[in-house]
Curated annotation (Swiss-Prot):
Its EC number is 2.5.1.19. It comes from Leptospira biflexa serovar Patoc (strain Patoc 1 / ATCC 23582 / Paris). One of its GO terms (cellular component) is cytoplasm. Catalyzes the transfer of the enolpyruvyl moiety of phosphoenolpyruvate (PEP) to the 5-hydroxyl of shikimate-3-phosphate (S3P) to produce enolpyruvyl shikimate-3-phosphate and inorganic phosphate. One of its GO terms (molecular function) is 3-phosphoshikimate 1-carboxyvinyltransferase activity. InterPro entries: Enolpyruvate_Tfrase_dom, Enolpyruvate_Tfrase_sf, EPSP_synthase, EPSP_synthase_CS, RNA3'P_cycl/enolpyr_Trfase_a/b. It holds the Pfam family EPSP_synthase. This is 3-phosphoshikimate 1-carboxyvinyltransferase. It is found in: Cytoplasm. The active site is at 317 (proton acceptor). The gene is aroA.
Length: 428
């Protein structure tokens, strides 16, 4: 296994930016609510800012209250305007899919949703098909089940759906469509996916009836009023420094403060602890319906572990950085049941395998994942990021830990989710 070439600096306490998933959803729930809301801890990365700007063009009044803080006034969902131009979501898959659901349920809304070249390659049929079954008019402009999407808002009908995959984006798109159209929705999935949307509904006074952990119903009335949102740090962003803190040399812990610990998102902690990582959760609390805490991460000897299928939905965004942990693990690393990785910002299975091979790692790629045996050395290489922020950050962590010189074709994608990443990496 690889050996770390650095130890922590004296400064062993960091904060990471606000949760990306919650930041997107906060904008959408501000739009659905009547009146003034305040948002604190908003991720000022390109993805959530694109979503915020899109809804600003439809009638939200947005003013800055300082770094990561905004005042947002909504005329109410029934008074949102059709945008005059195309809604550009940049690289934000969450933004475009969830917004498509919400807008599809607003009668009289007319909008075209698009994004950058990477986003326009990502599959949209997974939300288009069930939305159309609800009575929505959502079509792919190019006829290829990809963005741009043209939406004509309709009054939708009550709907029951069994999702073929565990996807918080599909679930949230359909639930937001139901909230917009004041209808009931019954939803069932195969595994528990992240539930920030459900938490936000409850936080705003809505009722969700759970039939099981993967099966629920949401019914009107939905009367949401403006409120104050406080967004915790993103555990998907913290994951890069959790792995860094586990794999670094020495014995001093790294303290990562104010992290969202939603049970549907902490699979990363479970996997790393199963690999032998020592991670302590302190200062636990609940805010705006979300569990929060601070993480103490200790340098640890890691080993290969079996990552079970039920954990995949809760670690899908963290698999690239878990792979880096695998390079520092006894016995190597394996991931399977992760076909969904092929539909992310890049085909993350191919992206990770391609870059690992550039490092000289012998990797076996299969349709739903990849594996490699214990690694002793890696070589200098140029990393291709495939326009994917998590690929860029994962290999930047590897370069810092290993001391191996890695160059990158483009690291600007990091700003979509983690502005300030390289400054924090330099500071530790």
């Amino acid at each position: 296994m690889l050996q770390p070439q650095i130890k922590l600096n004296a400064k062993n306490e960091i904060y990471v930016p606000g949760d990306k998933s919650i930041s997107h959803r906060t904008v959408l729930f501000c739009a659905l609510s009547q009146g003034k809301s305040e948002i604190h801890g908003f991720l000022e990365g390109e993805d959530p800012l694109h979503t915020l700007r899109c809804f600003e063009s439809m009638g939200l009044s947005v003013s800055s209250l300082g770094k990561g803080s905004y005042s947002v006034v909504s005329p109410g969902k029934q008074n949102l305007n059709s945008p005059k131009g195309v809604l550009d979501f940049g690289n934000a898959g969450t933004g475009i899919r969830l917004s498509a659901g919400l807008l599809a349920g607003l009668p009289g809304m007319n909008a075209t949703l698009t994004g950058d070249a990477s986003l326009c390659k990502r599959p949209m049929a997974r939300i288009m098909n069930p939305l159309q079954e609800m009575g929505a008019s959502v079509i792919s402009v190019e006829g290829n089940d990809r963005a741009p999407l043209r939406i004509e808002g309709k009054q939708l009908k009550d709907y029951s759906y069994v999702s073929p995959i565990a996807s918080a984006q599909i679930k949230s798109a359909l639930v937001l469509a139901a909230l917009a159209s004041d209808i009931s929705i019954e939803y069932k999935e195969s595994e528990v996916s992240r539930d920030h949307t459900e938490n936000m509904i409850r936080f705003l006074g809505g009722t969700i009836t759970h039939h099981s952990s993967v099966h629920f119903t949401v019914k009107p009335p939905y009367h949401f009023e403006g409120t104050k949102y406080v967004i915790p740090g993103d555990i998907s962003s913290a994951a890069f420094f959790i792995v860094f803190g586990l794999c670094v040399g020495g014995s001093e812990p790294l303290l990562i403060k104010n992290i969202g610990l939603n049970p549907s998102r902490i699979g990363i902690l479970t996997v790393l602890q199963n690999m032998g990582g020592k991670i302590e959760i302190i200062a636990k609390r609940v805010e705006c319906g979300e569990e929060i805490g601070d993480l103490l991460v200790y340098p640890s000897k890691l080993k290969r572990t079996v990552i079970t299928e039920d954990l995949i939905p809760s670690i899908i965004d963290e698999i690239p950085i878990l792979t880096i942990a695998g390079l520092f693990s006894e016995g190597g690393f394996q991931i399977s049941h992760a076909e969904e990785l092929r539909a992310k910002e890049s085909d993350r299975i191919r992206s990770m395998v391609s870059n690992l091979e550039r490092l000289g790692v012998k990797v076996k790629e299969v349709n739903d994942g990849y594996e490699f045996d214990e690694v002793g050395t890696i070589q200098n290489a140029k990393i291709e990021t495939f326009m994917d922020h998590r690929i860029a950050m994962s290999f930047a962590i590897l370069s810092k830990l290993s001391g191996v010189s890695l160059s990158f074709d483009d690291t600007s994608w990091v700003d979509t989710s983690f502005p300030g990443f390289f400054e924090i990496l330099k500071s530790v």
